Amino acid sequence: MSFTFAIIGRPNVGKSTLFNRLVGQKLALVDDTPGVTRDRREGEGRLGDLEFTIIDTAGLDEGAKGSLTARMQQQTETAIELADALMFVFDARAGLTPNDRAFADFARRANKPVVLVANKSEGKAGGIGAMESYALGLGDPVQISAEHGEGLSELYDALRAIMPEPEVEDDDEEIDGLTEEDFSKRPIRVAIVGRPNAGKSTFINRLLGEDRLLTSPEAGTTRDSIAVEVNWKGREFRIFDTAGLRRRSRIEEKLEKLSVADALRAVRFAEVVVLMMDSQNRFEEQDLRIADLIEREGRALVIAVNKWDLVEQQGGQIAQLRADADHWLPQVRGVPIVATSGMLGEGVDRLIDAIQDAYAVWNTRVSTAALNRWFEQAVAQNPPPAVAGRRLKLNYVTQTKARPPSFVVFCSRADAVPESYLRYLVNSLRGVFKLPGTPVRITLREKANPFAHKRKRKS
């Protein structure tokens, strides 16, 4: 069982910077604006030979009951309950504030080991602030600079002192490599994206059965891409809830630009992407832009039309959604569409089934024999057009990879094959081998002519 630390403290003391430093990558947004982190996020931390789970939390701050700030504090309290020990972080340059003192009491009442971290300890002011912290009664402060990586050896000593001795692994249990069965047990990486306030976090909370992610009628509540582990009927998923993606012209605030970049990274890391639309405003321009991005990144796509409980006269609406999707998104024709209600918990089973089906399609490999039978029939049924009086010759096709399914067609003149004919081949292949909603790549390549050098020498 992994040892878990929760990083706590008031807003803007450098908790997310420390989190990023310990996990070794920028998983949490960092900005000078207080309150950047809203949800709690988890990562696998490492410091020297120490390995542990680490939870980054929203800054502990006061807030009216039911407000976004109060719910941020509730997330922090939950993180403290889950943790084995706490890292209480304060800003040594700013010195102790009344909030630091109040929440130091809060940390003490948790009755868990506490590592007092004096962040931003560079310079004389930082040293003075660190000395002040003895008044908190939480032991010796560890003076660090999370931004510059200073003081990490001292932090290592403090963490090592409260962590249990690592268990010695049995040498007989070495893993030589993943089998097909092992691969099938890997968590499917899923990103849930969409415009702001489409209901992404509400839906994931319904899936988890807990208020794991902050939700609010205010658009843009989620700022980071938050990853959660889900076991649904024996299948593991790693689901990323992302910040809403707006049109570039509307992304004005620096912090929102960071959030959008974080969401795009989640899409690139995912295997299946769920594009969540609001049932009251579906297939708007930004939805289509997001779908196009997902296709260009080569990810499997599932469309979830959320807040379906708000739709009046639902009969026939799904058929209309299918027609709209195939019209506006021909590049992923047949994309799975699921009507959901995160608020009521409707459509969860159907969406999970659609994700698993999309993942299977994304991993499709077609046998060479079946592929070439299709190819011969497709070319015979609709031959490529002639160019300058000479018919193009398409020789054969081969699959180069899955994830997404990608193929190479060898032909006489690759640059002369029109885009319309390439689309014909993609749609035909998609229909015959049942590849709905996943990007299908076909690349044209000219077959080497073994007699070309002889002709060249002759002339």
Swiss-Prot record:
Residues binding GTP 2: 194-201, 241-245, 306-309
Residue numbers binding GTP 1: 9-16, 56-60, 119-122
Domain KH-like residues, every copy: 364-448
Record SUPFAM superfamilies: P-loop containing nucleoside triphosphate hydrolases (SSF52540)
The organism's place on the tree of life at top rank: Bacteria
An example molecular function term from Gene Ontology annotations: GTP binding
Keyword annotations from UniProtKB, A to Z: GTP-binding, Nucleotide-binding, Repeat, Ribosome biogenesis
Gene3D superfamilies the UniProt entry points to: 3.30.300.20, P-loop containing nucleotide triphosphate hydrolases
Entries under NCBIfam families matching the protein: GTPase_EngA, small_GTP
Task performed by this protein: GTPase that plays an essential role in the late steps of ribosome biogenesis.
Subunit field text: Associates with the 50S ribosomal subunit.
Family from the record: Belongs to the TRAFAC class TrmE-Era-EngA-EngB-Septin-like GTPase superfamily. EngA (Der) GTPase family.
Protein name (database record): GTPase Der
Species this chain originates from: Rhodopseudomonas palustris (strain HaA2)
